[in-house]
Amino acid sequence: MTQCNGFLGGQLLIAMPGMNDKRFMRSVIYICAHSDAGAMGIILNQLHHIDFPELLLHLGVIDSGQKKCLSEPIKQFPVRYGGPVDPSRGFVLHSDDYACEETVFIADKVCFTATIDILKAISCEQGPQHALVALGYAGWKAGQLEAEISTNGWLISSTSPSFLFESDLSCKYDKSLTRMGIDPTYLASEMGHA
């Protein structure tokens, strides 16, 4: 297991109301990695159109016979749209009770693994206690995220594992703002100067 920390790693990005890119409107993104070379994160509050059993079948983790035998919680396990970059690749944010050689520790008991093995473990209910599976990710080249933040595109917030792995996606945007002490109804898309 390796450790990844720096800049905004382990923080949330919350899209401002003036976000012009429709792919990121009302998005809450967990930053997995951030350095001088760029940034990478997973959108937390958008569902993907594929369900978990179909994803497992598509990746060859299970066959059609095994699909029928999956437990109900596994059949209902949500797959998130992680972002527009590499949309066919799977990524798992998870609690630190699961680790393999490829696992990266991000922050505060949160890890990141992008292997078939973790999907197999989750499908057999032998994976991490908390997990978030996503297809694709949000990526920024060097200086791009910093520029978007400086032009009022994103708010930055700390988070906790309990909030990160909370399953209710419909309220995650508003809850992210409320946790910062911001009433979403009063958040303006334009910034002012005195």
UniProtKB/Swiss-Prot annotation:
GO terms for cellular component: cytosol. Pfam families: DUF179. It comes from the Bacteria. Belongs to the UPF0301 (AlgH) family. This is UPF0301 protein BT_0659.
